Amino acid sequence: TSVEWPEKLRIAELGAGDGVLTRQILAQMSPDATLDAFEISSTLADKLNALDDPRMTVRTCSAEYLSGEYDVIFSGLPLLSLPTELREAILRAVYNALGPSGVFVQFQYTSLTQPDLSRYFTWERQRVLKNVPPAWVYRCTRHYAP
């Protein structure tokens, strides 16, 4: 597993979509943990709110507005399909919001985002073949400022 699940984790999910990963995160979280789910689509945000979990706050805005400090940040955002400036703004926001021992978990279907990730993070990756199509899971931690 890419993440340890101690009691009071502060978690963010970027691009929560229709809640497939969100439900799995909520199932793993302790009663004292919190989840901020970022979803830019108000239609999808409504579906997330329907999960009705008091530990979760749905934020209907772009992931570039991530702020505060998190222990774990999950992202399924298709980084390469985003405009360069937005991609950089999101990665900068993640870097700034990640606690000193925090973990950023990025799901991607290509390895072409590695140069972007490397500017901000030290990472290791794992191929998930059960996923269709197969995906890369990047487990990233902060390194010195870019």
PLM regions: where:
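Conserved SAM/SAH-binding beta-strand->alpha-helix loop
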Residues: S41
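A short acidic, Gly/Pro-enriched loop at the edge of an enzyme's catalytic core
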Residues: E64-I73
